[in-house]
Amino acid sequence: MSSDSFQRQLVQRTNTLNSSIDNATLTILSRFQDILDIAINEGKDKYTVAPEVYQIECHTVSMVRAVEQLLDVSRQIKSYWLTNSLSTSFPTVDYSEPDLEKVKRTLTKLQNHLLEVSLIEPEASETTEAPTVSDT
């Protein structure tokens, strides 16, 4: 899979998840506002309050569904992350065995050189004497 198609797929998934989050958030906020508008109880009789209680229950159920939708989005993101669903589409680079062996040899040489340098430096610091202060 090419890098461009992977990027398009990633953007599409991101946009889908963002729109799900936006829709759920909008539903929660609008239903909460509806509940607040209905909840104003200024001298209402019980025949008016009863249908309003039912409306509040319906809005509450809608809010719960929206929260469940947000939890589902969270689960999807975790699933993509845990199963590497996003990274399985990364373009792969094919290495041949000679290339890997060359890299291994180069890293081994570098490691050996660094070990030699670290062994030489302490010996050099041991042979140098600290400057002395003369009494004059």
From Swiss-Prot:
Compartment(s) of residence: Nucleus
Keyword Transcription: yes
GO cellular component terms listed in the entry, alphabetical order: mediator complex; nucleus
Name of a matching Pfam family: Med22
Keyword Nucleotidyltransferase: no
Name of the molecule in the record: Mediator of RNA polymerase II transcription subunit 22
Record GO biological process: positive regulation of transcription initiation by RNA polymerase II; transcription initiation at RNA polymerase II promoter
Gene this protein is translated from: med22
Assigned keywords, A-Z: Activator, Nucleus, Transcription, Transcription regulation
